[in-house]
């Protein structure tokens, strides 16, 4: 039996999985690393922590699996998007990495929007947001100019770890798409953008496909991990692209619903010219010459977490949600908007805050929970609605994360999205997508689709119920009015909020 390893470099920890040719996860490990937050809005990490914890996780994985190193054909990576790693000409790190959730770059974003207008949208198919890589680069250029002058190349987080394990520098299209420097449809760095902002295109790393073999392990890395030097290393992909691969989102009509702290609706896209006018993200997929569109709900699972911490800190989520299935659709006239930390899709608005509309004395805790679950799902449905309005088919939704752990919620998704919703048997997220890229790159399969047939198994399917679909359609129309009617109120309340 042969094996591959998938590595997922997350924001708080690195996860590794060992997968055999049947798609079975034979071992997994995880190692945490700290977040560095020196000021409000700052979010950084030391890239060295990623490297050391990844090597430790791999060493433990090999040790506990009892698999011989010669039977491990390849390794690939998934990683948190947008993070900025700057290297000098000696390939040494110049400063801590600035992460995707760092918000210091608002002034740079405003100036970029004023400078480029919709021209940036024509090239990158995305609007400027603080999370993207280019605004971080501009911040360093403005605030740490002497340091920035030493920059020979920039990398994304997973690409830096791969560089340290192989000695070669690359990035691939799915991660490059999140920099605001890539011409998405031409699949090349944009000299136009680089020239206009005064950054040399020479600092952009070489581009490869996600399944390309980029090298093998350095001797000291092989020695520390227990792997062989000849173990092939494949480029990998951005976490969302790998999450899509790991859930089988590889053909038109298939969409991913992922509910973690935030919520993501991600849909496969073949047509590179489809225009969403920046209302949703549009990125290169980990599957060659394919794309995906993505909408984000900032406080999806976070809404339930907030409710639990505030009103039921000693209960598990399973206990918390008991009895929700008995509450009728609409929670006895209660609607919730999940804007606890602002919103991303379809309203890019950092000032908006959440609402519970329709409260009365007859509502109890279960009504609030039902309303929160429905409100999160309505918010996610706004992204699906944008996809459908642009002519996309959404005939199957694969649900992963917190939203897939409760059958009532899965049925709710089927009814609100008005489509079939699939629960997976063995959900591994982006790490599985990375392993699949290694399996495909190693020649186990002719295509990622063939790999998905072998690796991904459905546990259950939920279908929309006509009477529920109609009720939710009425409620969804009411839900969409809440943003408009509370926007000015929340802006006026902003000065009263604790910073």
UniProtKB/Swiss-Prot annotation:
Pfam families per UniProt: FGGY_C, FGGY_N
Protein name, UniProt field: Xylulose kinase
Gene: xylB
Reactions catalysed according to its record: D-xylulose + ATP = D-xylulose 5-phosphate + ADP + H(+)
Top-level division of the source organism's lineage: Bacteria
Record-linked InterPro entries: ATPase_NBD, Carb_kinase_FGGY, Carb_kinase_FGGY_CS, FGGY_C, FGGY_Carb_Kinase, FGGY_N, Xylulokinase
Binding-site positions, substrate: 81-82
Keyword Kinase: yes
Cross-referenced HAMAP family: XylB
Keywords associated with the record: ATP-binding, Carbohydrate metabolism, Kinase, Nucleotide-binding, Transferase, Xylose metabolism
GO biological process, any: D-xylose metabolic process
Example GO molecular function: D-xylulokinase activity
Family: Belongs to the FGGY kinase family.
EC numbers, comma separated: 2.7.1.17
Keyword Cell inner membrane appears in the UniProt entry: no
Important for activity, annotated site positions: 8
EC category: transferase
Function, as annotated: Catalyzes the phosphorylation of D-xylulose to D-xylulose 5-phosphate.
Lineage: Bacteria, Bacillati, Bacillota, Bacilli, Bacillales
SUPFAM superfamilies with a match to the protein in the record: Actin-like ATPase domain
Active site: 239 (proton acceptor)
